[in-house]
A protein has these predicted regions:
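PLP-dependent enzyme catalytic core of the Aspartate aminotransferase-like
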Residues: 2-3, 174, 355-357, 361, ...
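N-terminal small-domain helix-loop-helix segment of the aminotransferase-like
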Residues: 5-114, 121, 288, 300-303, ...
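Conserved glycine-rich beta-strand-loop-beta hairpin in the small C-terminal domain of fold type I
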Residues: 298, 314-325, 336-350, 384
Length: 415
């Protein structure tokens, strides 16, 4: 039958899948879209919303780019699904230098198109409908989103602002049920900048032992530390537990666009053959991670660790952290715990001074008036409308101006 002879019917409406009902990622959400529209109209937007080092003048070490260029002729085909062997061996060597880190086999390392892809793969392989994952509040929201997408239920445990944003152990214990399957630890923490103490990490491991939970360790910022802070890998305090450690090149090596991440699996595996087969299946189904970026891993991990020049006294990242923290605390009604790591500050707006009922509206109004883009605290699954996240990547002078403008904005802002 020709199309002209078919009865006229309105086109079928294609709705969004119900699987996306609870999937939210505000870091690039509606306010970010509004910022893009303003940019298209010619406005200059200061983007304090995303931890993307390159636009702020942070360049990858030359040796990384040279190695990728040299490897391009050999990177035209697929690699092994887990990634090229030389990169995975370099990751094994990296963790051999981490005090107490459990033995890591090269076959237990998976490369990914950034940590984000490996989070997605892990949650899809791990979760059945209704399975619960303990996730910090505030969190990096992709963990919550991918838990929901996989059919799981994110259960947020509180981190205590009055204790340098360390996890609230009692709150975690109170939220464990017979459906709890995994405990996520983000350390150093995004968005708070907290670096967890050995005592807290041991208590988290004890909870996992007691309740037979899988440990998930997001440690992408483990080399971005300030003020003599020491990072302790979660796997190192729990060598007897199955632990999935996530890391990559995006932050410490300033190559977020290369999308080069990894997953390292340590601990006993006999009881987890089904999970590991699932991760294998999903890693194979995407064929392989992008191959050129895999060639950056060996040289990055084995070469000069230039991130140290940025975080020590006189380093740009340390200076910017200091400026952000100091200037935020100068604003009436604003307080900020000093970040010990990562690339963010998570200030609090005193509700007795700033009556914010809708932090999304606050962020949108700030964008429209001051052309500054931040992310509201509820975008990180913080329960109250009294926080926001600021990226500390801009030059110190730009940060100082932006925070001053933010303070001026707050002084007359009402909801």
């Amino acid at each position: 039958v020709s199309p002209s002879h078919l009865p006229h019917r309105p086109p079928r409406v294609l709705e969004q899948s119900t699987k996306l009902q609870n999937v939210v990622y505000e870091i690039r959400g509606p306010v970010h879209a509004q910022a893009a529209r303003l940019e298209a109209e010619g406005h200059r937007i200061l983007k304090l919303n995303i931890g993307n080092p390159a636009p702020f003048g942070f360049e990858a070490p030359d040796v990384i780019m040279r190695d990728i260029i040299a490897a391009l002729p050999y990177a035209q085909g697929y690699s092994e699904s887990k990634g090229i062997l030389s990169a995975r061996r370099a990751i094994v060597t990296r963790y051999e230098l981490v005090p107490g880190f459990p033995e890591l086999d090269v076959d237990s390392v998976y490369l990914g198109n950034g940590v984000s892809e490996l989070i997605t793969i892990t949650m899809q392989a791990l979760l059945d409908n209704g399975d619960e994952v303990l996730i910090p509040a505030p969190d990096y929201p992709l963990w919550t989103a991918m838990t929901s997408l996989a059919g799981g239920t994110p259960v947020h445990y509180l981190c205590d602002e009055s204790s340098d944003w360390q996890p609230d152990i009692a709150d975690i214990e109170s939220k464990i049920t017979d459906k709890t399957k995994a405990l996520l630890v983000i350390n150093p923490n995004n968005p708070t900048g907290a670096v967890y103490s050995a005592e807290i990490l041991q208590q988290l491991a004890d909870i996992a032992r007691k309740h037979q939970l899988l440990l998930l360790a997001d440690e992408i910022y483990d080399k971005i530390l300030y003020d003599d802070a020491k990072h302790i890998s979660l796997a190192s305090v729990a060598p007897d537990l199955l632990c999935l450690t996530f890391n990559g090149l995006s932050k410490a090596y300033r190559v977020a666009g290369y999308r080069a991440g990894w997953l390292a699996i340590t601990g006993p595996k006999d009881h987890a053959s089904g999970l590991l087969e699932g991760i294998d299946l999903l890693a194979s189904s995407r064929l392989c991670p992008n191959v050129p970026a895999q060639h950056a891993i060996q040289v990055a991990l084995g070469g000069h660790q230039s991130i140290e020049d940025l975080i020590l006294p006189g380093g740009r990242l340390l200076e910017q952290r200091d400026v952000a923290w100091e200037r935020l605390n100068m604003i009436p009604g604003v307080s900020c715990v000093k970040p010990k790591g990562a690339l963010y500050a998570f200030p609090r707006l005193d509700p007795n001074v700033h009556e914010i009922h809708d932090d999304s509206k606050l962020i949108l109004d700030l964008l429209l008036q001051e052309k500054i883009l931040m992310v509201q605290g509820t975008g990180f699954n913080w329960p109250d409308h009294d926080h926001l996240r600021i990226v500390t990547l801009p030059w110190a002078r730009d940060l100082a101006v932006a925070i001053e403008r933010f303070g001026n904005f707050l002084s007359s802002y009402r909801q």
